Amino acid sequence: MARAKRVKRDSATNIYRTCKQAGTCPPDVINKVESTTIADKILQYGSAGVFFGGLGISTGKGTGGTTGYVPLGEGPSVRVGGTPTVIRPALVPDTIGPSDIIPVDTLNPVEPSTSSIVPLTESTGPDLLPGEVETIAEIHPGPSRPPTDTPVTSTTSGSSAVLEVAPEPTPPARVRVSRTQYHNPSFQIITESTPTLGESSLADHIVVTSGSGGQAIGGMTPELIELQDFPSRYSFEIEEPTPPRRTSTPMQRLQNVFRRRGGLTNRRLVQQVPVDNPLFLTQPSRLVRFQFDNPVFEEEVTQIFEQDLDTFNEPPDRDFLDVQSLGRPQYSETPAGYVRVSRAGQRRTIRTRSGAQIGSQVHFYRDLSSIDTEDPIELQLLGQHSGDATIVQGPVESTFVDINVDENPLSEISAYSDDLLLDEANEDFSGSQLVVGGRRSTSTYTVPHFETTRSSSYYVQDTKGYYVAYPEDRDVSKDIIYPNPDLPVVIIHTYDTSGDFYLHPSLTKRLKRKRKYL
């Protein structure tokens, strides 16, 4: 028997509307619509004994009471629709409009008998143009000079008169000289003196002179107390530690030993594979499989190599066989003090039927060679300083050469020999070949060499540009067989003195040798 499908009934509000008049409403619908459930009764009975005021705590929507919800730290809320408070300004605003009111004269009515010509009259309105501008200029006269008397000398001799006028004296000029000095902290002045030619002492003297005289400061009176020489600011010594440090911030040995015990150097858990190929430092993926180079890709991250299970690809390097992943480079220091570049790899050697791959962990590493330090070079300070200057005197550092005037070294015949112009190179033509004819249409023919009881060799004529190679030693006096003879080819031994000839064994008919095992 099939179970009837359950049909969802209508909402409680719609059911209450239709069944209330008929009196067939279910009890749960009546309680829900009329709010007579157990929860509603608890609230009704509880509200009779407890009063919460206007907090609005009930089964209805939360409104926060009559004042609404107010966030902490803020003032009362503003209700929408209220009349805002207008704040009047403290100053009385000025009215906008013309400042001066110009009166307009009224015109009398015009009669018909009045002339239509309007006489011109002067306007009595206010002048819109500005009036006269008063200019006030203050004149400050310069300092008045005292009057100078110019002497005039008059001389009279005879009939001519000579008038001598003395030049006007020049008034004294007022000159003002100012000087400004700025201090540069990046520039340091070296006050040490350098022994040069003409100086008799190394004392530091400061001489201040002017146009009328001078005064010497320092070095005049000897010191009567025992003094101590302080080293110059540029002379210092660097103490080398023993043993010398290889890094600027050396680490503790205990930490290095703790790091060596675990990680990639654990030989029990990780296979150690040294790599000699320099591609391991820049492009390690080329050691795992053949591929094209991508100049944009940087191989400084972990690389994963996917390989089909049904195919087997031989890697370029046998040490990277069955490598699935190759980690990023790690730099460390070996006990000998070298820099080591390491990469952690994972092999996938065994594959199960379910598709799982099992392999060992591999540590690929390469030790970089050391950089030998060169011998230190003694450097000197640039500038003028004392104690390290070098003075070279010309007469003392001269070189004297004793030259014999009797000999004439300019004679080329006596000084040099023609044997220096001879070429001492020995030319060796063993194994060379002589080519006769052009190289454009050359043909090569191989001539068989027949071994006979007598030592004799035969060659083809080489007069039409053919190239014949003779790998064995040959004698000049040999017989020549022409390519197109008029008669049948017959081999004649010229060294035979009997006067007869015989057919060469290579020209006879060969008989097949019967094998017993066939």
UniProtKB/Swiss-Prot annotation:
GO-annotated cellular components: host cell; host cell endosome; host cell Golgi apparatus; host cell nucleus; viral capsid
Say yes or no: keyword Disulfide bond present: yes
What subcellular locations does the record give?
Answer: Virion; Host nucleus; Host early endosome; Host Golgi apparatus
UniProt subunit comment: Interacts with major capsid protein L1. Interacts with E2; this interaction inhibits E2 transcriptional activity but not the DNA replication function E2. Interacts with host GADD45GIP1. Interacts with host HSPA8; this interaction is required for L2 nuclear translocation. Interacts with host importins KPNB2 and KPNB3. Forms a complex with importin alpha2-beta1 heterodimers via interaction with the importin alpha2 adapter. Interacts with host DYNLT1; this interaction is essential for virus intracellular transport during entry.
Alphabetically ordered keywords of this record: Capsid protein, Cytoplasmic inwards viral transport, Disulfide bond, DNA-binding, Host endosome, Host Golgi apparatus, Host nucleus, Host-virus interaction, Late protein, Microtubular inwards viral transport, Phosphoprotein, Viral penetration into host nucleus, Virion, Virus entry into host cell
Give start-end ranges for motif Nuclear localization signal.
1-10, 509-517
* Positions with biased composition (Low complexity): 150-160
Q: Which family does it belong to?
A: Belongs to the papillomaviridae L2 protein family.
The molecule here is called Minor capsid protein L2
Describe the PTM: Highly phosphorylated.
The molecular function terms in GO held by this entry are: DNA binding; structural molecule activity
Location of region: Disordered: 139-173
Outline what the protein does.
Minor protein of the capsid that localizes along the inner surface of the virion, within the central cavities beneath the L1 pentamers. Plays a role in capsid stabilization through interaction with the major capsid protein L1. Once the virion enters the host cell, L2 escorts the genomic DNA into the nucleus by promoting escape from the endosomal compartments and traffic through the host Golgi network.
